[in-house]
A protein has these predicted regions:
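Structural alpha/beta core scaffold segments of enzyme domains
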Residues: 1-205
Length: 205
């Protein structure tokens, strides 16, 4: 505390020597690619993967129906899926994935998947998203409060809140800020290896 600490991996990153998941190459590896939604909000009417499945060099094709188990980025709320089940909720939502012998084959297979959508009215204004809705974008689970499109509200409490009453100054206000992605240097990729004993090694990002 109170001292400048050298960033131990700065030189590796600045000189391009840092190793990320996408730099890892394993013997006999397979390449996966993900098909993503071009729509903000839509129902998935059908997915035809037959062309991709019949292609030489394609080992597997999967959709949301193959990944029905739920998880939670916030572990207390396990209400998310690895891929869209019946509805896509943003541009880039995961629809299907392929596993192939190389990247070119995986991309060709991914692009051959035919998806029929029913495009729904999307919300692009925060104030509109807070209004009550008969048809919420997200399923209403036990953490969904009220009738709005707020996906979930989780209340957590930290510190001594009572001490704020004795604070000499206080300020309350509303703030708005745009979504901001961190300035990453690594590609979004992951490499996994299962050895004969069943041990899994994962390189990410």
């Amino acid at each position: 505390i109170g001292k400048s600490v050298p960033l131990v991996d700065a030189n590796w990153k600045m000189t391009g020597q840092a190793q990320y998941g996408d730099d890892i190459r394993l013997p006999g590896e397979l390449i996966g690619k993900i098909l993503r939604s071009p729509h903000h909000y839509a129902k998935i009417k059908s997915i035809d993967t037959s062309i991709a499945e019949a292609m030489d060099g394609v080992f597997a094709v999967a959709t949301g129906q193959d990944s029905v188990n739920k998880f939670g980025v916030l572990p207390v709320t396990k209400d998310e899926h690895a891929m869209a089940q019946e509805t896509v909720r943003h541009v880039g939502d995961l629809v299907a994935c392929v596993c192939a012998i190389d990247e070119a084959t995986a991309i060709d297979a991914m692009n051959s998947i035919l998806v029929e959508y029913e495009v729904l009215e999307s919300i692009h204004d925060m104030e509109d998203g807070l209004k009550d809705s008969e048809h919420p974008i997200h399923d209403r689970g036990k953490y969904h409060i009220g009738e709005s499109n707020v996906q979930k509200r989780v209340f957590q409490q930290f510190g001594d809140l009572d001490s704020m009453a004795a604070a000499p100054y206080s300020h309350e206000a509303d703030w708005e800020t745009a979504g901001l992605h961190h300035g990453f240097t690594e590609p979004h990729a992951v490499v996994a290896h299962w050895d004969p004993s069943g041990r899994v090694t994962v390189w990410s990002p």
